[in-house]
Amino acid sequence: MEIIKNKEFGGERPLFASHDLRLENVIIHKGESALKECSNIEAYECVFEGKYPFWHVDKFKIERCLFKEGARAALWYSRDLLMKDTMVEAPKMFREMINLELENVRIPFAQETLWHCHNVRIRKMDLEKADYLFMHSSDIDIKDYRQQGNYSFQYCKNVTISDADIDSKDAFWGTENITVMNSKLIGEYLGWHSKNLKLINCHIGGTQPLCYAKDLILENCTFDEDADLAFEYSSVVADIKGKITSVKNPRSGRIVADEIGEIIIDKNIKLPANCEIIQRKK
């Protein structure tokens, strides 16, 4: 493997079509497509300032690097990435990618990140300003994860999340086969139009959670006081610890909670309209 150390590059495609290359303490200045159409690339303690540095790359490792704000849309149309101990200050990272492993990565401006990505493994990640995160992605395994940003995980499939703190309006809309464990989910309109969403040992906050859901399961979950008007038009099996402020027109299934402040069943309920609702303290 060729090694380039302590160098600086800029302009258009300075390392285009490189193969079997390791970069150490390299700075990629303003320009475009520094490492486009490359394979078997390693970057260690490098700084990326220019746009689109890693497009159409096959097999690459990025460790202890910095992507500055100008390095937007840095990793697209690529596969087989391992990224560790890296700071990303640019938006629109990771698009149309396969086989990503991200460990100890921080993205403080993560808008429109991780779209159309498949087979993703994340361990220890912190994202802020992360609106429209994980759109149309699948086969995702996440642990030790912090996120602030709305409209996340929309239209995702086959996702497992544990030990997460997610602050997101409209999270998990239109998803299929999602399991979230030991996590905090704060944000209104959680999980609408989802299929096979399973929440285990989770805390839920925000108005009108989990409506229009199909085959929804909750095990040993808790609700904030503002998580009212839950389960409207959902088929649900839920075991809730503590109180739910209100439940409205669930379609079918079984809801068990210590206490429910208000149960709203009105003329607008949809068939089969046979959900069993049980309060342990009554």
Feature locations, PLM:
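Long, distal/terminal scaffolding or interaction modules
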Residues: M1-K282
